[in-house]
Amino acid sequence: MKKFRGSAAVAGLSVLALTLAGCAATEELTPTSSPTAVTEEATLAPLITVGWNDIVDTFNTSSAAGNNVANSLTAYLTSSSFNYYDNSPALVKNTEFGTYEVVSEDPLTVSYTVNDGVVWSDGTAIDGADLALAWATIFGKFKDADGVYMFSHAAPKDNVASKLPTISGSTITFEYDVQYVDWELAFGIGVAAHGAVQMAYPDLSIADAKSKLIDSVMNEDTEWLAAVATVWNEGYSSVNTPENPLVYLSSGPYVLEELVEEQYSTHVLNPLYTWGPKPQYERVTIRQIEDSTAAIQAVDNGEIQIASGQPTADVLALVQALANAEYASSEEAAYEHIDLTVNNGGPFDPASYGGDAATALKVRQAFLLSVPRNEIIEKLIKPLNPDAKVRTSVLFIPGAEGYDEAESYYSDYLGTDDENRVKAKALLAEAGVSTPIDVEFWYPEGNVRRGQEYELLKLSADSVGFNLIDESEPNWAFTETVFPDLNPHDATIFAWAATSLSVSGDDQYLVLGGPSNWTGFDNAAAKGLLDELNVAVDPAEQLRIRLAIEAELAKDAYNITLFQFPGLTWWDNEVTGVSPNLLVPYFYWNFWNWAPTAG
């Protein structure tokens, strides 16, 4: 079972999952130059320990199994890529790792080259084999006889780049089938090709593993690739230090040194790393601390130096009372929402009413109306952010162009909580269903704020004709379901956390069969619009399409959004260089700048 996610599922492109659209327009993504590296002569501090509510358990974050924030943090310490986001947020090119360029505008053709001397932590060159594996997995090239992706990528894009690439040395060149709007965010190297192949075929040498992988991709030899795909999908999960070092090969500044289940992961400097900014600590330990109060105490005691967590009013007060620490509080590029499952035979599935879609729709609408969003904001979020407001759109953040129009599609839900409960009761009466209606509701066990949200929701929903059943558990098992498997819960609450400012990508959870579609949502019009969005370069056209998608979500009572995620980071004042980021990986984004305070 996947031990997953104290707070949020990752959202993004390239090696991660879906995109949280609407954070910024494409033209804001202006690449800047690589950061200045710390001098080789700098004296390294021995260790910095940071807290997080979970630690790594899967080392392939490109896979559906590995797509969560905790895994992405270790990946960020131990990986390199062609670009990343700073905290502006602006896209920064890492030209010390490699380069990329548009070779042709029509058809859109791009080329990526890894620089000479860039190697995996075992000394093996990063080259065309790694690029070939990345291409095959990201673009969903290979499927089995049932049409299922052989490589279970978290966000496969099989409708944008289907033609085989050209590979030469450490360069890959490939053509897009369409003018893909997010091409600059779509490609990045994941796990080592020779590692995946050697785990599947242990008798192969590194050279043979690489050449066989390239040949099999180029010749579409799915029979040989099947074993590699199994490893890629399942072979990178481990809750303790993996016995096989191929599992955690690094291309970044750090490499895993030790992993202890539900306790900590320690990462030591990669002595071969020379292609990017240099960290100032020899080791980074990520310590699992699920309770924010305990993390505050740990900073106060000097046990850890940096922490972040889901704040409550009490947590913020404790952080503000710390005598030896600084803190930063701001909204993050993540949002809380409640999703409804429409294909599991539960109360929101038309099948429960003899296939009567209209009845199921009214029940969904009634439930969404019963969510006391205003009370949740007033009691749980405004103590952290006095300016906090209900977020009413799936695709647009508050204040963004298009948000007000998107909000208008949900006009029936914009009343007071009391007014909405009256509407909910009326809808259930119109539907002619027997009440109370059982709703099996999941939230992550141990998450204080989510528990508080559930209690407020249960009081409200039960008062209008529902019966919320607590199905909280810590393991997020429902995220392992991929259609046609069914989510056993009728409703779930969690947050999507964005890693990029991409325009496209919402098809991962809005298209049936998408790796993060755990609701069974299936809307042909929305699917067609999502395909259009992939190639919409004009910002005005992007806006039109996204508003049309939002209208479909509102019409179908897809889900209900609650609030923009409040973020809180605190750190010992003996550490400098801490700078929170609204995107994942949050405050880790510039770990190379963390340093002991001078003097």
Language model: regions and residue ranges:
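N-terminal lobe/hinge region of extracytoplasmic solute-binding protein
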Residues: I48-E105, L249
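Aromatic- and charge-enriched surface segment that lines or borders ligand/interaction sites
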Residues: Y100-G147, T166-E175, D182, A295-A298, ...
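Structural transition elements
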Residues: L384-L427, G446-R450
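Surface-exposed binding/hinge segments that line
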Residues: M150-V231
